[in-house]
Amino acid sequence: MQKKYVVALDQGTTSSRAIVFDHDANIVSVSQREFTQLYPNPGWVEHDPMEIWASQSSVLVEVLARAGIHSDEVAAIGITNQRETTVIWEKATGKPIYNAIVWQCRRSSEICEQLKAQGLEEYVRENTGLLLDPYFSGTKIKWILDNVPNARAQAERGELLFGTIDTWLVWKLTEGKVHVTDPTNAARTLLFNIHSLTWDNKLLEALDIPLSLLPEVKPSCSVYGTTRIAGEGSEIQVAGMAGDQQAALFGQLCVEPGMAKNTYGTGCFLLMNTGTKAVRSNHGLLTTVAVGPKGEVNYALEGSVFMGGATIQWLRDELGLIRDASDTEYFASKVADTNGVYLVPAFVGLGAPYWDPNARGALFGLTRGANRNHIIRAALESIAYQSKDLLDAMTKDSGVSLKRLKVDGGAVANDFLMQFQADITDVEVLRPSVCETTALGAAFLAGLAVGFWESVIELEHKACIDKHFIPNIDAETRVRLYAGWQDAVARTRA
């Protein structure tokens, strides 16, 4: 039977999805299932790894059944995943010894402080491209080994395996035959040297983590093993995987130095491909691994904003100013400007490039004439201002002045926001026809790995732009508006 489709498994923080793409990179079928968020203590976030697997495997069955697709027609399955989330399981039984510790979880803060006290901060920055923060997997692994009874003894005996979610899914799909990750996920563990592309012995020693725990690192665009859907039908190749933000970068075909994308979700993630050069950031960004045009390792600068779409949820849920996120475009367009109002949504501090956990949200510039529309508009504009903060930092670090920004995520449907993003950055903003770019990136990697598609050049002919947003304000206005934003940010940090 002819191979007509590629399936992407998109394992996210709140739901597991499966998306089928045809040879023209069109979406054929989608299935999604949410799973339980666990909060056992303040600042702790966990998932049940078995529930993640159950939700992911069930949507895989469902997405094919819904479209009437036979497993013989599927060329490959690609994987993209929430990054940093940590699972440890028994090699012999496949049973997790503890819940997955999620990227958002802050329980390992004390371990990070111990590493800082040992003088490891600069070594971590130089060799992993990351900051010493509980966000990343390494300190989560140490916490499990230190706190789960008998875990360290089992690990020393080589009886346990660690994986980020990509590794866990491949292990389950291949029925325990394959223990593997890719460089984009490995680079988020705090244990991977992004220059030598190997596990870092000094950091393993500092965290007391046995090497036997860790997966083999294979290219993002390669075949890892095979699986059968629900144990039935013909074998399908599991091929191609990347962490969610790097998958989106590849899905947008940002495979050359200086190409960048911004994902507008709960927060915003802006990544710029820097090619074969790992650029050290002096402006609060992370240096991370990306995927090049032939599936090889490239590097990227990454900046994250904590409050993107979450700011709009706040308008809806806490202030009751809107009923639906889509209402914001209508209300924001009813006024010519914000009437001098700025919203700095530092509800949980500020992310890149400030990294200020103590900053708090604030509204500035309120006068008697300020109304609901001005506040809603200021909330939308805050997303674009924060993205400009990241872009400016990237320009300073890389020396590359961006001309075009590719965008994806839920908020890109908002034309007002996209136009203001173009205006305030003085950069053309490109919105793709298929906004599921994270899943598309996983599908592209899988399809390229098995020859379903020949090259990135072929994929470029399939990538359609829905709309171009061209900068439409003068330089003087741009400078004045952004100066107001910078002043507002400074005051939230005072």
Curated annotation (Swiss-Prot):
Any one GO CC term of the record: cytosol
Gene Ontology MF terms: ATP binding; glycerol kinase activity
Residue positions binding ATP: T13, T14, S15, T266, G309, Q313, G410
Keywords associated with the record: ATP-binding, Glycerol metabolism, Kinase, Nucleotide-binding, Transferase
Kinase keyword on record: yes
Pathway: Polyol metabolism; glycerol degradation via glycerol kinase pathway; sn-glycerol 3-phosphate from glycerol: step 1/1
EC number(s) on file: 2.7.1.30
Binding site for ADP: T13, R17, T266, G309, G410, N414
Swiss-Prot/TrEMBL catalytic activity: glycerol + ATP = sn-glycerol 3-phosphate + ADP + H(+)
Binding site for sn-glycerol 3-phosphate: T13, R83, E84, Y135, D244
EC supergroup of this enzyme: transferase
Regulation of activity: Inhibited by fructose 1,6-bisphosphate (FBP).
PROSITE patterns: FGGY_KINASES_1, FGGY_KINASES_2
Sequence positions that bind glycerol: R83, E84, Y135, D244, Q245
Gene Ontology biological-process annotations: glycerol catabolic process; glycerol metabolic process; glycerol-3-phosphate metabolic process
Family the UniProt entry places it in: Belongs to the FGGY kinase family.
Function, as annotated: Key enzyme in the regulation of glycerol uptake and metabolism. Catalyzes the phosphorylation of glycerol to yield sn-glycerol 3-phosphate.
Protein name in UniProt: Glycerol kinase
Biological source species: Shewanella baltica (strain OS155 / ATCC BAA-1091)
